[in-house]
């Protein structure tokens, strides 16, 4: 065999090997920015994402969430209203047209408290995002029942801290604090009762399960706002006499025990008192979450899941617990616990921002894979209450809204008729907005969805199928090589057969 023939044969073999490797090796894709371009709305950052610090995409997420809250306003709107498709509404009580225009103070107050708490902890995030004024406007715009009175007192006390310490508005802070004190006094001096017993109409919507957690919660926030130890004494007394220790209930608008553990630990540490009891309470609660000993678990995709609570709005327990973990992490009793709580919180943030089996960021308006059909009448733009699919396409983008979220199998139905998965709510965005402020301060990279190409992933090929493909390709390659080496004999055999 001459050298030219040998080189030719080697070239064919090399080509065959390269072809096989290309079949077996997935093509890598250069990273691109797949986030949707921002709308031309005042206050929405326009700078594209570039992994810089401070990160413009996290700034947008904070701005979008604040925009979402503006879209929820009703009544006589201010002249600086940024939501072009929202107009004055609900100027009367709706009775003359048969509409129920009820507002629910209980979950609204919790929302304000959590946003204020997050802003007190991570105010720098709002400053870096240039959203402090919009935060102020949002918090500023905000019947007998022990639970509601205690929660509303907490909201006003927390807001008073924000206006005093961050916005330098002592006058308004004092007004809020006066209302907070009066509400808490009202909660304590009237007969203890759940508010749905006084207002039965709310029972089917946002009923309360207890009120002692709100009495502790409200007293703690009043202590933080006033430094009056009588409020701390009240909180400790209500806590000790009403069996609130060691509970494993999910922190949300109805249940404050988890938040009380963390806030107790914070306040005792900040005041220089012995905080060991309260850190023990907080860490028992948070360890139960991250170690799955609280009765909850994780979906295959990594979403924190609690049967019952998560069935109604799956992202709610995830975001609420992530919020508490990041609030408490800096004062944990060990660096290992600090890192564990932070890692848990970041995993839930990533899931919500697209690191999930269907590559869906559950924030409206940030990515082509974002939910397109939130269960929201104003954004839908229709006028037929009996038909939520008329028109079929959502008319307005509800930027920043967090939807209910996927099911236990990480599947998501992007249909406005599936209100469990696509409904939006004030309390869904409260922990999310605070978490984005945390990320604005601490993250040096883009949100996960920025590098996620549009489209949902195809089903993954199993390991067995991959092995089978490899074996088949190798066999085909061997056959091709043998056929090449025996080509003369094959040609001669074929020639003889035809004769």
What is each residue range found by the language model?
Residues 497-499:
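Non-transmembrane, juxtamembrane loop and terminal tail segments
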Residues 462-480:
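Single-pass type I membrane protein transmembrane segment
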Residues 1-8:
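N-terminal secretory signal peptides that target proteins for export/translocation
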Residues 8-30:
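Cleavable N-terminal signal peptides of Sec/SRP-targeted secreted and luminal proteins
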Residues 33-121, 133, 141-162, 202-244, ...:
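Aromatic (Trp/Tyr) and acidic
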Residues 143-183, 190:
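A conserved hydrophobic secondary-structure block that centers on an alpha-helix together
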């Amino acid at each position: 065999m001459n050298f030219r023939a040998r080189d030719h044969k080697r070239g064919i073999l090399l080509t065959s090997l390269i072809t096989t490797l290309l079949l077996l090796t997935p093509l890598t894709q250069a990273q691109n920015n797949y986030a949707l371009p921002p709308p031309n709305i005042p206050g929405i950052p326009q700078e594209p994402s570039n992994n810089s610090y401070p990160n413009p995409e996290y700034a947008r997420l904070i701005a979008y969430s604040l925009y979402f809250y503006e879209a929820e306003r009703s009544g006589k709107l201010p002249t600086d209203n940024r939501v072009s498709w929202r107009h004055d509404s609900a100027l009367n009580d709706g009775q003359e047209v048969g509409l129920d225009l009820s507002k629910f103070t209980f979950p609204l107050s919790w929302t304000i408290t959590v946003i204020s708490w997050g802003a007190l902890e991570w105010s720098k995030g709002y400053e870096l995002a240039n959203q402090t004024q919009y935060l102020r406007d949002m918090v500023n715009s905000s019947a007998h029942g022990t639970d509601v009175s205690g929660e509303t007192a907490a909201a006003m006390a927390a807001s008073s801290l924000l206006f005093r310490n961050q916005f330098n508005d002592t006058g308004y802070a004092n007004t809020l604090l006066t209302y907070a004190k009066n509400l808490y006094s009202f909660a304590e001096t009237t007969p203890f009762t759940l508010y749905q017993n006084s207002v039965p109409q709310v029972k089917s919507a946002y009923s309360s399960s207890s009120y002692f957690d709100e009495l502790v919660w409200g007293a703690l926030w009043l202590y933080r706002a006033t430094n009056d130890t009588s409020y701390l004494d009240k909180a400790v007394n209500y806590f000790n006499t009403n069996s609130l220790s060691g509970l494993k209930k999910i922190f949300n608008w109805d249940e404050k025990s988890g938040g009380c553990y963390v806030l107790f630990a914070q306040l005792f540490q900040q005041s220089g008192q012995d905080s060991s009891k309260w850190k023990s309470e907080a860490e028992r609660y948070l360890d139960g979450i991250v170690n799955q000993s609280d009765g909850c678990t994780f979906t295959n995709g990594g979403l924190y899941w609690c049967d019952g609570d998560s069935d109604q709005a799956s992202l709610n327990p995830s975001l609420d617990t992530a919020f508490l973990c990041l609030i408490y992490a800096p004062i944990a009793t060990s660096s290992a616990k600090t890192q564990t709580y932070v890692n848990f919180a970041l995993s839930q943030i990533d899931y919500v921002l697209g690191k999930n089996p269907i590559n869906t960021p559950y924030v409206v308006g940030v990515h082509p894979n974002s939910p397109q059909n939130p269960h929201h009448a104003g954004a839908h733009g229709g006028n037929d209450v009996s038909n939520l699919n008329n028109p079929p396409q959502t008319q307005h983008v509800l930027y920043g809204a967090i939807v209910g979220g996927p099911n236990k199998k990480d599947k998501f139905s992007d249909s406005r008729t599936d209100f469990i998965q696509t409904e939006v709510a004030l309390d869904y965005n409260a922990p999310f907005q605070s978490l984005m402020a945390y990320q604005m301060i601490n993250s040096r990279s883009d949100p996960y969805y920025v590098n996620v190409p549009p489209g949902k992933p195809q089903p993954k090929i199993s390991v067995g199928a991959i092995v089978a493909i490899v074996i088949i390709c190798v066999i085909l390659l061997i056959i091709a090589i043998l056929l090449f080496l025996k080509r003369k004999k094959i040609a001669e055999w074929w020639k003889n057969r035809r004769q």
